[in-house]
């Protein structure tokens, strides 16, 4: 890389931009449009290599090959982002500025050496992403959500809202969903906790998965949904389709943002209401964020038990408060006490998950909602993770603990055929 290091970044980017323009002038774009993906890429790569090898620049053969690949990515892909999108260990791509590209790998953020040429180059890639899904981003509409072909979730925000230039965030999703076995291997939870959670799902308890940004709520929801019997009819509702359920009888619904004229939006609440007319056995909502919380509670309370959803909150009690606030967004003027009664009646358990400072994810608590206590929602922890220390390498140490509490819903599960081992609830700790 010595040649590339001595060859100033600005010069390298300029040569790449100049070659990009020259190559586009040489290509028969109409002919390429009729070619298949692989044959078109191969044909363009030959043109690119000829153009690169014709340039008098201090680059080795390997560096010229890299330059050729980067120009190919500019023409067919998403420029500097392409190598990151091909790296399955990358879970998030965060572009703060054109020359500040971060990734999350194994729960840790790291700065890459990748860069766009300038803000205009970054803006060009953002426009390419959103145009592929029929969206637009400009000064009149400076925020946009989109999805890549592989299911990755994209958010872009541009000036004047983004002061330092366009920003791009991409949440990646693996081709194969994380399994329960992998969560055990990663020590996200214990065998005993998983045994309880699987019984709760099979026993048709309504479960709320709570956690902060990047905590792994959707991953856990996907694992829990895997325990829904194959005979059940499932309707999933999401802002951006992320769940990867394997059951046969499943209907996937997704919200729709407004079009260029600001019309045609379909919100989660509309989909939840519509799903009730689709004879679902289970309703799985990717994340409740607003007024749809009321309709979700109604569904849980009126024959659609065994439903699952997630909420953005930092503790089980915060999750209850968040749901209460979201119900108020429906503007139905229901008294607070009545709302709490409805929540306590609808939600059987809250599973709190968190991403710790070392990047690992842990199920922090499995809590039962036991009813009302003097006007407040009463809860009790069944399992918890207790942090004990952070070692010299920054690794969080702790133990999973069974609190010794036998949940009230154990009898309900037994009646439904899911009899839990008494030893499951004996007070004990597991590393």
Model-found features: residue ranges?
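NTP-binding/hydrolysis catalytic cores, primarily Walker-type P-loop NTPases
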Residues: 359-431
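N-terminal anchoring/assembly modules that precede and organize ATP-driven motor systems
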Residues: 1-110
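Conserved lysine of the Walker
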Residues: 217
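Switch/coupling sub-region of P-loop NTPases
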Residues: 194, 198-210, 223-346, 352-354
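Conserved phosphate/pyrophosphate-binding and hydrolysis machinery centered on Walker-type P-loop NTPases
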Residues: 9-13, 33-42, 57-68, 83-91, ...
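P-loop NTP-binding catalytic core
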Residues: 87, 95, 100-203, 421
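Active-site phosphate-binding and catalytic loops of NTP-dependent enzymes
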Residues: 31-34, 54-61, 76-87, 129-146, ...
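Walker A (P-loop) phosphate-binding loop of P-loop NTPases
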Residues: 214
């Amino acid at each position: 890389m010595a040649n590339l290091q001595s060859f100033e970044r600005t010069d390298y980017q300029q040569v790449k931009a100049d070659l990009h323009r020259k190559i586009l002038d040489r290509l028969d774009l109409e002919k390429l449009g009729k070619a298949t993906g692989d044959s078109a890429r191969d044909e363009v790569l030959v043109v690119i290599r000829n153009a690169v090898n014709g340039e008098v620049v201090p680059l080795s053969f390997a560096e010229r090959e890299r330059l050729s690949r980067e120009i190919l990515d500019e023409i067919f892909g998403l420029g500097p982002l392409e190598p990151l999108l091909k790296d399955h260990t990358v879970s998030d791509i965060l572009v703060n500025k054109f020359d500040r590209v971060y990734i999350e790998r194994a729960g840790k953020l790291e700065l890459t050496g990748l860069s766009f040429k300038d803000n205009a180059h970054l803006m060009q890639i953002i426009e390419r992403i959103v145009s592929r899904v029929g969206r637009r981003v400009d000064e009149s509409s400076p925020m946009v959500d989109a999805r890549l072909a592989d299911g990755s979730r994209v958010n872009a925000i541009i000036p004047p809202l983004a002061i330092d230039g366009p920003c791009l965030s991409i949440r990646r999703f693996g081709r194969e969903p994380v399994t329960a076995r992998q969560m055990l291997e990663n020590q996200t939870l214990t065998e005993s906790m998983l045994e309880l959670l699987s019984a709760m799902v099979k026993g048709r308890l309504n479960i709320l998965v709570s956690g902060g940004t990047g905590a792994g709520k959707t991953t856990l929801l996907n694992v829990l949904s895997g325990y829904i019997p194959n005979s059940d009819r499932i309707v999933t509702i999401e802002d951006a389709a992320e769940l990867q359920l394997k059951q046969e009888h499943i209907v996937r619904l997704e919200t729709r943002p407004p079009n260029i004229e600001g019309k045609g939006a379909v919100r989660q609440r509309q989909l939840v209401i519509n799903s009730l007319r689709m004879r679902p056995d289970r309703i799985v909502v990717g994340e409740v964020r607003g007024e749809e919380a009321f309709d979700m509670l109604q569904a849980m309370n009126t024959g659609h038990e065994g439903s699952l959803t997630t909420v953005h909150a930092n503790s089980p009690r915060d999750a209850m408060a968040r749901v209460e606030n979201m119900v108020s967004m429906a503007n139905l003027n229901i008294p607070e006490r009545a709302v709490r009664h409805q929540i306590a009646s609808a939600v059987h358990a809250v599973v709190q998950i968190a991403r710790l400072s070392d990047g690992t994810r842990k199920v922090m608590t499995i809590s039962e909602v036991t009813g009302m206590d003097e006007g407040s929602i009463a809860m009790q922890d069944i399992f918890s993770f207790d942090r004990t220390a952070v070692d010299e390498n920054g690794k969080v140490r702790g133990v999973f603990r069974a609190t010794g509490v036998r949940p009230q819903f154990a009898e309900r599960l037994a009646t439904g055929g899911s009899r839990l081992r008494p030893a499951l609830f004996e007070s004990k700790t597991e590393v």
